[in-house]
Amino acid sequence: MSDKYYRSAYMNVDLNAVASNFKVFSTLHPNKTVMAVVKANAYGLGSVKVARHLMENGATFFAVATLDEAIELRMHGITAKILVLGVLPAKDIDKAIQHRVALTVPSKQWLKEAIKNISGEQEKKLWLHIKLDTGMGRLGIKDTKTYQEVIEIIQQYEQLVFEGVFTHFACADEPGDMTTEQYQRFKDMVNEAIKPEYIHCQNSAGSLLMDCQFCNAIRPGISLYGYYPSEYVQQKVKVHLKPSVQLIANVVQTKTLQAGESVSYGATYTATDPTTIALLPIGYADGYLRIMQGSFVNVNGHQCEVIGRVCMDQTIVKVPDQVKAGDSVILIDNHRESPQSVEVVAEKQHTINYEVLCNLSRRLPRIYHDGDQRFVTNELLK
C-alpha cells in the first residue's frame, strides 16, 4: 500500500489509543487470551496496521469474518493465531490449512463436507472452533448431542484439532436476562464434552460487563477502537476507553451564495441572505452519508451546518466569512464529548457506531499516529 495520497480528505487513526484499549481488556481479564477482533478492516481503521500494532503490544490471537481477511493479514506478516468467525465454503478448506488459519464449525454437515475437501497433499493441522447457538439464532449447533457428535468426528482425524468452542451473545449490550441465560446454556453444553484449549463467549459488551470465569478467552471488537457497544454499557462500566478515529476534510473552495441562490442536488437549500459556503472534497462514497445534511461540523472551532444534499464526492458547509481554502474541518472527532463524536454521527444517521466506522470507505487515506511517528496507508495506490 502506498504512503502517498492526493486528496484533501482522510482519517486519523490513533494507534496508541487502540493499544491502550487493548490493555484495558488485558487488565480486566488478566488470565484470559484477548482475541482481538479485526474483521471488517478492523472496523474501518485498517486491519493490517491495527493488527501489527496490537502484536507489538502483546496480542497473540486475532479474529476475522472471512478467510480473505485472514489471508490479507498473513500476506502482511501477521504471524499470530487467526480465527475465521464466519463460514468458509468447504471447497476452500485447503487454503485455510495452507495459511494456518483456524476455522469455525457451524454444523455437523459443514464438518463432513470440509473433511471431504481436504486434499491428500495437505499435511498441516487444521484448527477448529465449534460454534454453539445458545440464543443468537444464527450460526451454530443448538443441541448437546450434535455437539458431542461433532467432537467425535474431529477426533477421528489426526489432522484436525479441536482447538476451541464459542458462542455469541445477542443482547449483551442491553439490560435483561437473556445474556445470563445464554451463558448458562453455553456452560451446560460445554460441560457435557471434553474441553478444548479455548472457551470464549464474551464480545465487547460481555467483556466489559461480565466476568465469565468459565471462559479463558474474550473477543472484544468495537471497544478495542475506543467505542462502547451501547449507551447502556457506557453508563454501567467505569472503564475509560479512548476513541481512535477522526475524519478530516480540508476546504477546497469558498464562495458566496446570494439571496435566492441554491446549492447542490435538488436545490434543497436556498440562501435568504448572502451566505459564505465551503466545499469539502468528501461525500457519501467515503461513508459521509446523504442523511448528514443539517448536521454540524467543526471548522476552526466553529460549529457549521452542512447545507444542501451531501453528494457522492462533495459536501457543502455554511461557514463564517473568514474561512478559506485549506482550512481543516472535523467531520468525526475522537473526543467523546465532541458534537462530532461517532455516537452523535450515528444518532444523526439513525444507526449505531459500528456502522458509522465500517462505512468509512477504502478510498479514504488512513493516517496512523503512534506517538511522534506518522504512517500513511492509501489502499487505492497499492
Swiss-Prot record:
Reactions it catalyzes: L-alanine = D-alanine
State its cofactor: pyridoxal 5'-phosphate
**EC number(s) recorded for this UniProt protein:** 5.1.1.1
| Gene Ontology BP annotations | D-alanine biosynthetic process; peptidoglycan biosynthetic process
Positions of substrate binding: 138, 312
- The answer to whether the entry has keyword Isomerase is yes
Q: Which UniProt keywords apply?
A: Isomerase, Pyridoxal phosphate
Active site positions, chain numbering: 39 (proton acceptor), 265 (proton acceptor)
Q: Which SMART domains match?
A: Ala_racemase_C
Which pathway, metabolic or otherwise, does it act in? Answer: Amino-acid biosynthesis; D-alanine biosynthesis; D-alanine from L-alanine: step 1/1
Select a single GO molecular function from the record's annotations and give it: pyridoxal phosphate binding
PROSITE patterns in the record: ALANINE_RACEMASE
SUPFAM superfamilies from the xrefs?
Alanine racemase C-terminal domain-like, PLP-binding barrel
| One Pfam family here | Ala_racemase_N
Residues bearing N6-(pyridoxal phosphate)lysine?
39
Q: Give the highest taxon in the source lineage.
A: Bacteria
**A single cellular component GO annotation:** cytosol
Complex formation: Homodimer.
PANTHER family, from UniProt?
ALANINE RACEMASE, ALANINE RACEMASE, CATABOLIC-RELATED
Family per UniProt?
Belongs to the alanine racemase family.
Q: What does this protein's UniProt record list under function?
A: Catalyzes the interconversion of L-alanine and D-alanine. May also act on other amino acids.
Q: Which NCBIfam families match?
A: alr
Name of protein: Alanine racemase 1
Source species of the chain: Staphylococcus aureus (strain COL)
Gene transcribed to yield this protein = alr1
